[in-house]
Amino acid sequence: AYRYGDGSNVLVAAFAIHGWEDNFNRDGQLLVDTAHDLMEALEQNYDALIKEGDWSVYVLPCLNPDGLYDGWTCNGPGRCTTYRLNANGNNVYGPGIDLNRSFPYRYQSRSDDRNYNGSAPLQAREAQALAKFVQSVKGSGSNVLIDTHGWYRQTIVSGGESGPVYRAFNRYFPQNRYTSLAGGSGYFASWAAYVEDYDAC
């Protein structure tokens, strides 16, 4: 993770939890590129963008690097990791884990290649590390998590349509359809919102 600022309010901006989304091969790379654009803007203009001492911004440019770089499909390894953990905690290569279906919020085991998520939550090292990270950086002020995906023109948020996160996104993406995170089964952002108390999308 890359940190900008040292405020008590925390923003976690996460990208490419699916190395392959649904538009074209390795389209998660566009999300990684967007993360790098954000990092460049923060490096060059942090003082103009954010009041000193107000926010700590963490950018995680690629949550699923093995899926992005070693995967080959949006319906298995690529969208998912290229491995999973067995009962002994060892890597088993083959059907990987859909990291965005593997968090302990409304978790339901999925066996299809596209959304395979193991027999229990957090059966991938990336998901375990991500959960620990989000818990460890939580601030004493506002906590916001943005899990960036692509292509569906929807803004999936906690806090409803009147909440601050949806209102901020709707100002810039008014064409996007509103969806609630509350129904997300194993979603990273749903877990952050309803278990860890982040405002999330």
PLM ranges: what are they?
Residues 1-8:
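Short beta-strand-to-loop junctions in surface cap/lid or active-site-entrance loops
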Residues 9-18, 146:
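Short beta-strand element of the alpha/beta-hydrolase
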Residues 175-201:
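C-terminal regions of proteins
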Residues 1, 88-95, 182-189:
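Phosphate-binding glycine-rich loops and adjacent basic patches that engage nucleotide phosphates
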Residues 10, 143, 199-200:
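Structural motif
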Residues 12-14, 98-101, 201:
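Active-site-proximal beta-strand elements of phosphoester/diester hydrolases
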Residues 6, 105, 183:
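Functionally engaged cysteine thiol sites
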Residues 20-166, 170-171, 175:
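Active-site/substrate-binding loop(s) of hydrolase catalytic cores
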